[in-house]
Amino acid sequence: MEGKKIIKQEKYINITEDFMNSIFKFFIEKKELKKGIPYCMKKFSRKSFACSGQSELNRYNILFVPENVYSEKKDVVKTHEYFMDYLKHYGFNYLYVMKKYEMNFYQVYCMISILHEIGHIITMNKSIDIHGYNKIYIESQSEYYYNEFLSGETQMEHYRNIECERIADKKAVRLFNKYEKEIIEFFMKIEIEIREIE
């Protein structure tokens, strides 16, 4: 006798390749990004900045934004909230944005997380040397390695203060402030969906 299959519902946000390409196109048109992907990223990125665990690199996940950033796990939610709270240092108040545009937490998290990763790419494009290396990212490798041995809020605080991450955070807020209306139009389209999994 076969056991009964257990179907459970899971909330998720589906960031499609078309959606990501439209964001790339927007920032290329605004001359914030150069056309194409900085190849140095493929040399030195072993895992995702925004969501660890991805290993395959292509145009879609070069920003390291996972297909599903929605989570009900308390430790993951705490990390998301810490990231958003930390951006208040640079003038980004996610609670204000949520209220102003009637967006939910994960829409705003998706938005600023993607802008953060675009901040990394802008930095890489501008700091690449004649050999295709990024000095600032190479110098930060030891800090990323050290961060893996930390835990809890100490780890989160240290991570946000790694020079590469600080720069990307600042650029994310700058991009939002500069293109707020257009960026909001992109990310208000994102909805939390329900899917059934066995």
Regions found by a protein language model. Give the residues of each.
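Long, well-structured alpha-helical subdomains associated
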Residues: K4-N14, D18-F19, E148-E198
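Post-HEXXH active-site segment of zinc metalloproteases
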Residues: F105-Y109, M124-R160, C164
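A metal-dependent hydrolase signature that marks the N-terminal structural subdomain at the beginning
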Residues: M1-M103, E182, F187, E193-R195
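Substrate-binding/catalytic groove segments of enzymes
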Residues: I121-N134, N177-F186
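Hydrophobic, Leu/Ile/Phe/Ala-enriched alpha-helical segments that form helix-helix packing faces
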Residues: I23-K31, I118, I122, F176
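Extended low-polarity, hydrophobic cluster-rich segments
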Residues: T16-F19, V108-M111, L115-I118
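Active-site recognition of the HExxH zinc-binding catalytic motif
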Residues: I112-N125, A168
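Catalytic phosphate/metal-binding cores of nucleic-acid and nucleotide-processing enzymes, i.e., regions
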Residues: L87-M98, S113-L115, D129, Y133-K135
